[in-house]
Design a protein with these regions (language model features):
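N-terminal domain-onset segments
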Residues: 1-88, 225-227, 232-234, 240-256
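Interaction-surface and assembly-scaffold signal
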Residues: 2, 6-16, 20-23, 119-256
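Alpha-helical protein-protein interaction elements
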Residues: 25, 34, 67-70, 78, ...
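Generic structural signal for short, solvent-exposed loop/turn connectors between secondary structure elements
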Residues: 51-52, 58-69, 95-101, 139-141, ...
Length: 256
């Protein structure tokens, strides 16, 4: 991996070690990407304490004059990507600035070195390595038609662990995410990387229990607890190449 992408802004103390950096090769899978996945998503509105924690992990040029409105957690199994299948967990913060919404990613962890490098070099996403463990069916739960257990996972890295357990409804409905909400990341030189993902698939209502054992820099704002969310299957995601110009989102990122 190009060393300029090793120090991207993200959660302190949950990053890449010098040994990990030296072992990573440069990405050979440039954007855009078209991928197929299965994803479990949930959200919460941050309280005052969580907003203070978000302020500590989102770079000032991104959060200037903006208010965190929503934190979205996602546990994703990528079934098909340019670098092969892999797993990912992430937390996305949706901000509002002057009536406009945008999102940014302070935390993302994967079990694929190639996926890690591509995420950093293509979109300036602060991906870090993690191990994923299948938790199976919750203890004592009856087998029910339509209940999905293969997204019950524990995800861990040095000094942190997140556990997600879920049950889902039985009726899938069409789901579509249009390429409207911009994601704004800062590149290694502070330049804005701006892109608008889109997705379509099928979704089912999910009930989740999310437990976080991590340093305060992650624990205090990650959407933990009992949540209602959605399980997305047969999910087709498009990740376009970012723009790096001073367009609308870039100008907004620089406002003071």
């Amino acid at each position: 991996m190009r060393r300029t992408f090793a120090g991207l802004a993200g959660v302190p103390d949950i990053g890449l070690s010098p040994e990990e950096i030296s072992a990573l090769s440069e990405s050979r899978s440039p954007a855009p990407w078209a991928v197929r996945a299965r994803a479990l998503c949930w959200a919460r509105r941050p309280d005052a304490s969580a907003r203070r924690a978000i302020e500590a992990v989102v770079p000032e040029p991104v959060r200037a004059n903006a208010t965190p409105e929503l934190v979205v957690g996602a546990l994703i199994h990528y079934e098909s990507t340019p670098v092969g299948p892999y797993d990912e967990i992430t937390a996305v913060v949706v901000h509002r600035r002057a009536g406009t919404l945008f999102a940014t990613v302070p935390f993302m962890a994967v079990d694929s070195p190639a996926g890690l490098v591509a995420g950093r070099e293509n979109w300036a996403l602060p991906k870090t390595p993690a191990e994923f463990e299948d938790l199976g069916r919750p203890h004592g739960e009856q087998e029910l038609s339509g209940t999905v257990h293969d997204m019950n996972r524990a995800v861990a890295g040095p000094g942190w662990r997140i556990e997600v357990e879920t049950t889902t409804g039985r009726i899938p409905l069409p789901a579509y995410v249009p390429p409207v909400l911009p994601l704004l990341q800062l590149g290694p030189g502070g330049e804005p990387f701006i892109f608008r993902p889109s997705a379509h698939g099928r979704g089912r209502r999910a009930r989740l229990s999310v437990r976080v054992d991590a340093p305060p820099a992650l624990r205090d704002w990650f959407p933990a607890g009992r949540r209602t969310g959605v399980l997305l299957t047969d999910l087709h995601i498009r990740l376009p190449a970012p723009t790096r110009s001073t367009g609308e989102a870039g100008r907004a990122a620089r406002r003071r």
